[in-house]
Amino acid sequence: MLLLDKINELKKIVAESSSIVFFGGAGVSTESNIPDFRSENGLYKTKNNFSYPPEVMLSHTFFKNHTEDFFEFYREKMIFKDAKPNAAHYSLAKIEEQGKLKAIVTQNIDGLHQLAGSKNVYELHGSIHRNYCMDCGKSFDLEYVIKSETTIPKCDKCGGIVKPDVVLYEEGLDDSIIQNSVKAISEADTLIVGGTSLVVYPAAGLIRYFKGNKLILINKSATAYDNEADLVISDSIGKVLETVI
């Protein structure tokens, strides 16, 4: 099937759907100049000036034992303060506005879906925009972490370490986020999966809960679920979704 035919098929599916859920990964934000993890230009493949590989530095153990190094890496490689939503984010917000898109389940931590206007967003891996004191629980915004005078941001109330509300390796996902995501996916008539290679578990396993009619995959590279999908589009997610609205 030609790309144009696939896009027309996608338009038809969206038009006939009343309960769509979008499940997205890092590829959704690469068009906002936020690197993904596993592609050739991704965080895990590109050179950096740190002594440890990124997947080690993004672990709970590393955060606990090398807190200063963690924050140096986190500020430099995980925060993209000036990133703006792209065509994919805005298109999804529009489909939600039309009443068709019921939820976005995202593996991203950048908050760009909300910035584009999406309301019902489940952030599996947390958000850079939420930070909290590990001792007293006080909440802080991203600006507080960025502008901290010390490498390790400290609570202005009790002096405890302010930790980003992002899920590190070795940490579990939030139960309520998982439950809401499972509920949304299991009740959807159409599931659009975009910008993810579906290799990160337990997040990727959520697709198993889909019982609806149409599974659509939009990703530049192949995924393990391609054979199970009703429609596979190997192209830019922003370009594809923009044609639907």
Swiss-Prot record:
Residues that bind NAD(+): A26, T30, F37, R38, Q107, I109, D110, H125, T196, S197, N219, I237
Protein name: NAD-dependent protein deacetylase
Compartment list: Cytoplasm
UniProt: nicotinamide binding residues: F37, I109, D110
Keywords annotated in UniProt: Cytoplasm, Metal-binding, NAD, Transferase, Zinc
EC number: 2.3.1.286
Annotated cofactor note: Binds 1 zinc ion per subunit.
Enzyme class: transferase
Encoding gene, per UniProt annotation: cobB
Residue ranges occupied by any Deacetylase sirtuin-type domain in the UniProt entry: 1-245
Cofactor(s) demanded: Zn(2+)
GO cellular component annotations of the record: cytoplasm
Role according to the record: NAD-dependent protein deacetylase which modulates the activities of several enzymes which are inactive in their acetylated form.
GO molecular function, one term: histone deacetylase activity, NAD-dependent
Residues at the catalytic site: H125
Top-level taxonomic group: Bacteria
Lineage: Bacteria, Bacillati, Bacillota, Clostridia, Eubacteriales
